[in-house]
Amino acid sequence: MSSVEVNRENADVANTNRQANLAEGYEIKELNESQKQYIRSSIPILESSGVNLTKAFYQKMLGNYPEVLPYFNKAHQISLSQPRILAFALLNYAKNIDDLTSLSAFMDQIVVKHVGLQIKAEHYPIVGHCLLSTMQELLPSDVATPAFLEAWTTAYGNLAKILIDSEKKVYQSQPWNGFVEFKVTELINESSDVKSVYLGPKDPAFRISHAHPGQYVSVLWEIPGLSHKTLREYSLSNRVDTCRNQFRISVRRVAGGVVSNFVHDNLKVGDIVGVSPPAGNFVYKRSEENVNRPLLCFAGGIGITPLIPIIETALLDGRKVNFCYSSRNYVSRPFKQWLEQLKLKYKENLKLKEFFSEESSVTKEQIVDEVMTRIINEEDLEKLDLSECDIYMLGPNNYMRFVKQELVKLGVEPNKVQSEFFGPYIP
């Protein structure tokens, strides 16, 4: 290692330690009324120009702090979905500055997201510095006064402290922190554009622990041609096999997707990746109260992955499952063999209805109770028995919005529909 590389590494370590010290300095400071008014005065600006502000913030942060690059998907910056969700968060924080309790559910989602990505306390000062300096640079000088910036500095410090403490509690309960090296042990094509990747610890002495059905892991990839490592989240697509000491994820090829195309075209058995501990609250729930209650499951496309262990576990528990599965077409539908085996084993307890949006004709298979060559619609949902069932749903955002909206119209309480969103999402 050259002296330049050593100096750079020492500088990186010193910077990380400095950020960690800053993070430890966060404490809750009650905002006075004058400071709250400064935060409220931000509302019109955030409503009209919030995305422009957060877009500039991300450009500043990602351009000056390479250590945070792995945590962000470039596609989400290009589509502005990441800036939009931050603008949404800032706006609602300002609107609720007098009482943040109404944001508790949203903040819980942030904690889950951060833990899944293994966000650390030392990242918060970076975000705070870039956010405040972006405000100072972009907002008019008569708005971004020292008092205005001080109010936002205090408000951000309060938010950071809440999130850091909440995330710390979750980290303490996890079997490991950070990313452990795992080796690709097997690759299986599940359909024309879905590939399953089996991952086992590089160190055979390292034992994986139980994961709740429905949880996901973050995988740290090193892609040739990229200047930095990059993270992606994947649901565990089977019941975790602790005996074989491995996880399974399943990756759909996305047009233009850097990571998904690498997985499909270049990933090999023996390759090494970093894997986080399982995380997420979209999990199978078992209790004395619901032991005899049926499950109603909706999956759109690759959204089937977390439902595989959820459905399997429910059937093993003796519960009935009504499964509505939507795919683009027959050749892209993954896990055909799994569906066949499950249907043959649980003939009476598993009802399977499939929807293919791109096919004019599909031969009904023995395993399928009903096939539709169209997208799921209101009439399909009206025919379902919605009384006393646990509802699980995962798929594209628009798909989930539609299904949940229609279920609510039919009398289902919104909080009864369990779902999860990957990537930036505005509730």
Curated annotation (Swiss-Prot):
NADP(+) binds at G301, I302, G303, I304, T305, P306. PROSITE patterns: FAD_FR (PS51384), GLOBIN (PS01033). The active site is at Y124, E167. Gene3D superfamilies: Globins (1.10.490.10), Nucleotide-binding domain of ferredoxin-NADP reductase (FNR) module (3.40.50.80), Translation factors (2.40.30.10). FAD binds at Y216, R232, E233, Y234, S235, F421, F422, G423, P424. It is an enzyme of class 1 (oxidoreductase). It catalyses: 2 nitric oxide + NADPH + 2 O2 = 2 nitrate + NADP(+) + H(+); 2 nitric oxide + NADH + 2 O2 = 2 nitrate + NAD(+) + H(+). CDD domains: FHb_fungal-globin, flavohem_like_fad_nad_binding. Keywords: Cytoplasm, Detoxification, FAD, Flavoprotein, Heme, Iron, Metal-binding, NAD, NADP, Nucleus, Oxidoreductase. Is involved in NO detoxification in an aerobic process, termed nitric oxide dioxygenase (NOD) reaction that utilizes O(2) and NAD(P)H to convert NO to nitrate, which protects the fungus from various noxious nitrogen compounds. Therefore, plays a central role in the inducible response to nitrosative stress. In the presence of oxygen and NADH, it has NADH oxidase activity, which leads to the generation of superoxide and H(2)O(2). Under anaerobic conditions, it also exhibits nitric oxide reductase and FAD reductase activities. However, all these reactions are much lower than NOD activity. PANTHER family: FLAVOHEMOPROTEIN (PTHR43396:SF3). Belongs to the globin family. Two-domain flavohemoproteins subfamily. This is Flavohemoprotein. It comes from Schizosaccharomyces pombe (strain 972 / ATCC 24843) (Fission yeast). The lineage of its organism: Eukaryota, Fungi, Dikarya, Ascomycota, Taphrinomycotina.
